[in-house]
A protein has these predicted regions:
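Extracytoplasmic
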Residues: 10-40, 55, 217-222
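Helix-breaking motifs and short loop linkers at transmembrane-helix boundaries and internal kinks
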Residues: 34, 86-92, 230
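Short hydrophobic/small-residue motifs within alpha-helical transmembrane segments
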Residues: 47-49, 136-137, 241-245
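Conserved MFS/SLC helix-loop-helix module at the cytosolic interface between two early adjacent transmembrane helices
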Residues: 53-91
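Juxtamembrane intracellular "pre-TM" segments in multi-pass secondary transporters
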Residues: 176-204
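Extracytoplasmic gate region of multi-pass secondary transporters
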Residues: 201-240
Length: 252
């Protein structure tokens, strides 16, 4: 794997882990913030809202070199996860989670462009899949590791490690990812012209309903494994490894 793709995969790992780690540590977070588990689910929603809002960065940052955007996204992830680690009240954690979600969608769009551009001829798809593998690894290993840390030590440590990882990723992106030119500017209207065809709307609907179903299950996976399934808290990380493995197999 090229070092540049490895650097991008590192960023994908951070964002994948930051998105899903809250599912595994929801009970501990709810206790620390003195809220109910359903109310703590808003920390997951705040991240999702950040993802939606953050995609606008690509719309208004279309003239910025992609490498600079990746560095910006990792800096935002650094701030968001640092704030999550030190949050002392529920509103602060909500804001921190919103900030953490801002770079998510925009990162994958930009990283895909870079991965395709830097790939050897005929290996564009492989290059992109290797970049996305960072998020897959986060689902299978990163999230269970965060759950284990929360159970053994503190849920704050999971976010602190992600913040440190974001800082490291900024360094390797600066060092390993070459600069490429921004994509040809088609204007704001041009970026949405594809929506005049029915095909993209069908894809968007499929993604919407598919992700809605996954998040309905995944958001409260830790509480229902313990309270409904009867599993002990120490078994949750191992069960989440199996869930992550299922995602990997499903993706294949």
């Amino acid at each position: 794997m090229k070092r540049s793709i490895l650097a991008l995969a590192s960023g994908a790992f951070i964002l994948g882990a930051a998105e899903f780690v809250m599912m595994g540590i929801l009970p501990q977070t709810a206790t620390a913030m003195h809220v109910s588990i359903p109310a703590a689910g808003h920390y997951i929603s705040a991240y999702a809202i950040g993802v939606c809002v953050g995609t606008l960065i690509l719309v208004f940052g279309r003239k910025v070199p992609p490498k600079h955007l990746i560095i910006l996204f990792m800096a935002i992830a650094l701030v968001g996860n640092t704030l999550s680690a030190v949050s002392f009240c529920s509103p602060m954690l909500l804001v921190a989670r919103f900030i953490s979600g801002l770079p998510h969608g925009a990162f994958f769009g930009t990283a895909t462009l870079i991965a395709k551009t830097l790939a050897d001829k005929g290996k564009e798809a492989q290059s992109v899949s290797m970049m996305v593998m960072g998020q897959t690894v986060a689902n299978m290993l990163g999230v269970p590791a965060g759950t284990l840390l929360a159970e053994a030590m503190s849920w704050r440590l999971a976010f602190a490690i992600l913040a440190a990882w974001a800082l490291m990723t900024i360094v390797v992106v600066i060092s390993w990812v070459p600069s490429i030119d921004p994509i040809k500017d088609a204007g704001i209207k041009g970026q949405f012209r594809f929506l005049t065809h029915p095909g993209p709307w069908l894809i968007l609907l499929a993604v919407f309903f598919g992700n809605s179903g996954i998040f309905c299950w995944w958001s409260y996976v830790s509480p229902w494994l313990q309270k409904t399934g009867g599993w002990s808290a120490t078994m949750v990380p191992m069960l989440m490894v199996l869930a992550g493995l299922g995602m990997v197999v499903g993706g294949i």
